[in-house]
Swiss-Prot record:
Positions that bind L-aspartate: 79, 165, 220
Gene: pyrB
Assigned keywords, A-Z: Pyrimidine biosynthesis, Transferase
Subunit record text: Heterododecamer (2C3:3R2) of six catalytic PyrB chains organized as two trimers (C3), and six regulatory PyrI chains organized as three dimers (R2).
Annotated positions binding carbamoyl phosphate: 51-52, 101, 129, 132, 258-259
Similarity-based family: Belongs to the aspartate/ornithine carbamoyltransferase superfamily. ATCase family.
Naturally occurring in which organism (per UniProt): Rubrobacter xylanophilus (strain DSM 9941 / JCM 11954 / NBRC 16129 / PRD-1)
Catalytic activity: carbamoyl phosphate + L-aspartate = N-carbamoyl-L-aspartate + phosphate + H(+)
Pathway this chain belongs to: Pyrimidine metabolism; UMP biosynthesis via de novo pathway; (S)-dihydroorotate from bicarbonate: step 2/3
One annotated GO molecular function: amino acid binding
Name of protein: Aspartate carbamoyltransferase catalytic subunit
EC number: 2.1.3.2
Length: 305
């Protein structure tokens, strides 16, 4: 089977999510080690990244692929070359998969139009971040006792939803898995599509706990993407939308895609608390992204056959 682009989780159903996470569990157990031998994976990261970039590289290497890393500073994009021309170049040089991180929403979909290689969306501006949502589901499912136990779990997505590509992937993925969701954000940080999602909108972390949330999915306040004043002040924002130690008394699990701004969306002493799934989310990155690379290159189907 040939290349399969991996751009979004919109339209992905519960069965498809289960299959991907089962494959990730197999990858974690080592069943895909060396399976990408002879394949070339290009990591084209044109926006800053730590967790996503490192875990994709570790995943590709663990699966046996040859890995090429490209950044804006080290590529002809710094000389004015377009994204399309860069992608075509990587494709013609023989990349089997192009893992793309880009500051513009829709960049991965654009790249996929011009590449025969599989394009994997590693985050495109305020657009999508599908592999993050998958590793979040993987981590949460393990914490509740398995994928089937996700049905009926109540989770609140808290913070800067407007600028969050993670939220735009987490929301459809969690809903497809049966998780009940609510949004917790000031009106100035809600996107237009929030009305289409049809989810309850709450005004504080305290209200989310009253709603019955057992999971608080915290989002970073993305001040670098803001074009104007969206909140009165960081202190005022944290008063309503930050999770502190007192919230842990309700027995909630805390999640965050990273990077964490300690003291803004999460109190510093909560990040590594036993109630925090953040370390588990990071650890899940290699297995989940190994599964995505195996699916994108067609190797997973070949091994299964």
């Amino acid at each position: 089977m040939g290349a399969r682009d991996f751009l979004t989780l919109e339209g992905c159903d519960r069965g498809e999510l289960r299959e991907i996470l089962e494959l990730a569990a197999g990858c974690e157990a080592g069943r895909m080690d060396g399976a990408l031998a002879g394949k070339t994976v290009c990591l084209a990261f044109f926006e800053a990244s730590t967790r996503t970039a490192v875990s994709f590289e570790l995943a590709a290497r663990r699966c046996g692929a040859d890995v090429i890393s490209l950044s804006e500073r080290g590529s002809s994009i710094s000389k004015g070359e377009s994204l399309v021309d860069t992608v075509v170049t990587l494709d013609r040089l023989g990349a089997d998969a192009i893992v793309l991180r880009h500051p513009a929403a829709g960049a991965a979909r654009l790249a996929a139009r011009f590449a025969a290689a599989a394009v994997v969306n590693a985050g495109d501006g305020c657009g999508q971040h599908p592999t993050q949502a998958l590793l979040d589901l993987y981590s949460l499912s393990r914490s509740v006792g398995g994928f089937e136990e996700l049905a009926g779990v109540r989770a609140a997505v808290v913070g800067d939803i407007l600028h969050s590509r993670v939220a735009r992937s987490v929301i459809p993925a969690f809903r497809a898995a049966g998780v009940e969701l609510a949004l917790v954000a000031p009106r100035t940080l809600l996107p237009v599509e929030a009305g289409v999602w049809g989810l309850p909108v709450l005004s504080s972390v305290d209200e989310a706990l009253e709603w019955g949330a057992s999971v608080l999915y915290m989002l970073r306040l993305q001040r670098e993407r803001m074009t104007g004043a969206r909140v009165p002040s960081v202190a005022e924002y944290a008063r309503y939308y930050a999770v502190g130690r007192r919230h842990l008394e309700a027995g909630v699990r805390v999640m965050h895609p990273g990077p964490v701004n300690r003291g803004v969306e999460i109190a510093g002493d909560v990040v590594l608390d036993g109630a925090s799934l953040i370390p588990d989310q990071v650890a899940a990155g290699v297995a989940v992204r190994s599964a995505v690379l195996a699916l994108a290159t067609g190797v997973a189907q070949e091994v299964a056959a």
